[in-house]
């Protein structure tokens, strides 16, 4: 019988313990931030009826959808994000969860896009959303969560780029693009501006919408506007655009209101700026939208993005439920943290390893391990009484912070020898309490 070659599909990946532990550590940190703001967890299926998903995603997303017939002949698809399943969830359970509803969800999503650096076809999203209120307070709180999450991860240099879909709609209208379908196509192309550049964006606008050179030039000129200095000066500079139409006026007014709230907080004002090229590729956004880039690693793209979606539940319910939320791209953020050397990677969840010089000492070793665990110190016992060199080689490979050595003297005196694997300092024959204190100090 021929052996099967072990392999994974392009765009899909395994995670070895070091990376999986780093990811779990990251998710634990951001989950704690979510709960500090009062968000509660929910779970939804990976597989949904296709019609649940396809009416909400953009044309681009629908092309990337993993869609098929299941064994029962049902038209199903793998979820491409966690927001559309949320709309279905809230419509289905709104009486049980109550509104306004603040939730977070962590899970894998699937998109059949081209695999490349920082982009996978299966990746983990980490979403937090505020459903049931159109207050600008909710938009501000979502941005607070983004800020707090990145700071918690040790990232201090980042920019949250803000825009408003009404501003983009108004610019399109001013440039002669009036049909909703054409506006959505234009915004999808404009969203690529920072990724593929003006020349290619111009080509796509002319090819897909038949725009003339003057229309393209105007569209690119106004969607290239970015805030450079203080917000007060920036809003004065763009005030002339408010006279063009009501859409632009409303969008700018909403951004001003958001800035008023944010200015009262302890968020660094340099971390959030307006950028009229931010359109977001998903068709359901209706209000303020945002993307977050790392200042030291802009090439990796947005690590957290989102916006307001006042019409998301229209497919499932006649009742209008406003919502706003964001999604952290965990896999992309992990890649960025590793490149920035902010990721501590260990191949074990334990801080310490107990090694024995004889199998007769296993009982004492497990007793010590039990005592350490009762004091919230993750620890494990090496399962064989091998040569110390072999056991220490294993400890180095896994990345333990400490090694506890049990030899004849330690066994007889009910003490232990503790070695700090980072500093190399070793203290012989000390008590359990002394060792515990030393580990807790680190």
Swiss-Prot record:
Enumerate the InterPro entries for this protein. Answer: aa-tRNA-synth_II (IPR006195), aa-tRNA-synth_II/BPL/LPL (IPR045864), Anticodon-bd (IPR004154), Anticodon-bd_dom_sf (IPR036621), His-tRNA-ligase (IPR015807), HisRS-like_core (IPR041715), HisRS/HisZ (IPR004516)
Tell me, what is an example of a GO biological process annotation in this record?
histidyl-tRNA aminoacylation
* A Pfam entry, by short name: HGTP_anticodon
May I ask which residue range the UniProt record assigns to the signal sequence? none
Q: Which PROSITE patterns match?
A: AA_TRNA_LIGASE_II
Top-rank taxon, per record: Bacteria
Swiss-Prot/TrEMBL keywords: Aminoacyl-tRNA synthetase, ATP-binding, Cytoplasm, Ligase, Nucleotide-binding, Protein biosynthesis
- Enzyme's top EC category: ligase
UniProt xrefs under CDD domains: HisRS-like_core
Provide the catalytic activity annotation.
tRNA(His) + L-histidine + ATP = L-histidyl-tRNA(His) + AMP + diphosphate + H(+)
Quaternary organization: Homodimer.
Name of this chain's protein: Histidine--tRNA ligase
- Organism per entry: Helicobacter hepaticus (strain ATCC 51449 / 3B1)
């Amino acid at each position: 019988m021929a052996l099967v070659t072990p392999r994974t599909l392009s765009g899909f990946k395994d995670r070895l313990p070091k990376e999986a532990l780093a990811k779990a550590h990251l998710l634990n940190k951001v989950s704690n931030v979510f709960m500090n703001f009062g968000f509660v967890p929910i779970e939804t299926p990976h597989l949904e009826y296709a019609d649940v998903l396809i009416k909400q995603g953009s044309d681009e997303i629908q092309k990337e959808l993993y869609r098929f017939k299941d064994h029962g002949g049902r038209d199903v698809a793998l979820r491409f994000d966690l927001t559309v399943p949320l709309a279905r969830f809230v419509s289905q359970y709104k009486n049980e969860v109550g509104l306004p509803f603040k939730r977070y969800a962590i899970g894998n999503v699937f998109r059949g896009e081209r695999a490349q650096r920082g982009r996978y076809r299966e990746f983990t999203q980490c979403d937090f959303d505020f459903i049931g209120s159109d207050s600008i307070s909710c938009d501000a709180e979502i941005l607070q969560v983004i800020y707090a999450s990145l700071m918690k991860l040790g990232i201090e240099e980042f920019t949250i780029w803000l825009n408003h879909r009404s501003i983009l709609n108004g610019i399109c209208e001013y440039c002669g693009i009036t049909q909703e379908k054409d506006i959505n196509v234009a915004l999808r192309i404009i969203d690529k501006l920072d990724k593929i550049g003006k020349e290619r964006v111009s080509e796509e606008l002319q090819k897909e919408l038949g725009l003339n050179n003057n229309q393209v030039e105007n569209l690119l000129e106004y969607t290239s506007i970015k805030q450079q200095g203080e917000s007060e000066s920036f809003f004065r500079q763009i005030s002339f655009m408010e006279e063009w139409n009501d859409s632009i006026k409303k969008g700018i007014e909403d951004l001003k209101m958001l800035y008023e709230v944010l200015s009262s907080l302890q968020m660094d004002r340099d971390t959030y700026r307006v950028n009229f090229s931010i359109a977001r590729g998903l068709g359901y956004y209706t209000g303020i939208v945002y993307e977050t880039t790392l200042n030291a690693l802009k090439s990796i793209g947005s690590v957290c993005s989102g916006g307001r979606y006042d019409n998301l539940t229209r497919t499932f319910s006649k009742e209008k439920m406003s919502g706003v939320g964001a999604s952290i791209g965990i896999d992309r953020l992990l890649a960025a943290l590793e490149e920035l050397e902010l990721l501590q990677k260990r191949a074990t969840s334990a801080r310490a390893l107990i090694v024995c010089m004889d199998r007769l000492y296993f009982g004492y070793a497990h007793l010590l391990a039990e005592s350490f665990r009762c004091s919230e110190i993750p620890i494990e016992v090496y399962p064989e009484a091998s040569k110390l060199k072999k056991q220490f080689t294993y400890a180095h490979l896994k990345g333990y912070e400490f090694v506890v050595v049990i030899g004849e003297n330690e066994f007889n005196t009910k003490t232990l020898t503790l070695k700090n694997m980072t500093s190399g300092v070793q203290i012989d024959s000390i008590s359990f309490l002394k060792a515990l204190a030393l580990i807790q100090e680190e």
